[in-house]
Amino acid sequence: MTTSPRALLLDVDGTLVDSTYVHVWTWHRALAEAGAPVPFVEVHHRIGKDGSTLVGELLDIAGVDDDEDRDRVAGRAKDLHSEYYAEAGDSLRLLPGARELVRGAKEQGWVTVLATSAPPSEFAEARELLDVDDAVDAVTTGEDVDTAKPDPTIVAIALERSGVDAADAVMVGDATWDAVAATKLGIRSVAVRTGGIGDAELREAGFSDIVDDAAGVLDLLSSGRL
């Protein structure tokens, strides 16, 4: 008797790579320099969300109302964020158990997909750091979609590339938007705490399980709880 293959759809930023607070800092700095200062907490709770949506919401908070001003400030902030994030590349590190999770899942027969909507340049840094291409079956990047999470399209593409049905897939992420997107597609989702979001928010977003980090996800896999 053969069993159907299962797919592990892995968010990257904040889940496998310790980049959440790098994004918080660089967006915060970029918005302030572009003329739209906002509190750090407002940036943090939007990390992982589609970039244009993130910026639009933060411009609302900053009180930038004029359409022409919004376009100018948004464009400048996005350019600065890309610049500052690239400068911070040397500070990126893997999160606990990241590489082991990808390799362990593959060894256990899972189809593994790096399901990110990061720009290709940012993903390339993370991919090099992870060094698990031989254990990855498919990837996505921001080039695959017009709008990122919580819009489910990027997760739908990751699922399609896995060749597995939604009922046999699990999404792993650190942000509420990962669960929102997965739930829309009928995909179970598991949260890691490495993005700095509290358990109550993660549960409310729809995550079925919450663990400390990628190592905890591997424990779930190895014990048959996923």
Regions found by a protein language model. Name each.
Residues 1-6, 103-106, 119-226:
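Asp-based, Mg2+/Mn2+-dependent phosphohydrolase catalytic module
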Residues 2-103, 107-110:
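N-terminal helical cap/lid subdomain that shapes the substrate entry/recognition surface
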Residues 89-93, 117, 189:
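Short, flexible loop segments at the rims of nucleotide/cofactor-binding pockets, characterized by
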Residues 94, 115, 147:
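Residue-level marker of regulatory loop/turn positions in helix-turn-helix DNA-binding domains and
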